[in-house]
């Protein structure tokens, strides 16, 4: 996952998830933000990742598995409007939390 970063926006009723590619020290967006459970963010990310040239199938599986774990964690902790960011970081070291609202 060192080549990819998952970004989340932690909201009270939704979680927004996007994937960026890390090239050197710069991040480049690979996907839009998709909202769970407002829409099926996992499926939308899968479709968008499927369309990415040069993305290996094993990397896609790792990314989507990580997204699944993040969604599960959000569902278990969504009552917490502001998550404990250090706890989030310990569960998901490659995660970038874009904000909490």
Swiss-Prot record:
Keywords of the record, alphabetical order, are: Chloroplast, Plastid, Ribonucleoprotein, Ribosomal protein
Name the GO cellular-component terms.
chloroplast; ribonucleoprotein complex; ribosome
What InterPro entries does the record point to?
PSRP-3/Ycf65_sf, Ribosomal_PSRP3/Ycf65
Gene3D superfamilies given in the database record: 3.30.390.140
Taxonomy, superkingdom: Eukaryota
Q: Name one Pfam family in it.
A: PSRP-3_Ycf65
The entry sums up its family as follows: Belongs to the chloroplast-specific ribosomal protein cS23 family.
Q: What task does this protein carry out?
A: Probably a ribosomal protein or a ribosome-associated protein.
Listed name of the protein: Small ribosomal subunit protein cS23
Q: What organism is listed for this UniProt entry?
A: Cyanidium caldarium (Red alga)
């Amino acid at each position: 996952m060192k080549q990819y970063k998952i970004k989340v926006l932690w909201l009270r009723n939704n979680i927004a998830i996007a994937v960026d590619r890390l090239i050197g020290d710069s991040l480049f967006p690979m996907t839009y933000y998709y909202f769970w459970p407002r829409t099926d963010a996992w499926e939308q990310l899968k479709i968008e990742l499927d369309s990415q040239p040069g993305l290996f199938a094993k990397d896609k599986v790792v990314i989507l598995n990580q997204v699944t774990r993040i969604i599960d964690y959000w569902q278990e902790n969504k009552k917490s409007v502001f998550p404990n960011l250090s706890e989030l970081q310990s569960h998901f070291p490659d995660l970038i939390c874009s904000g909490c609202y």
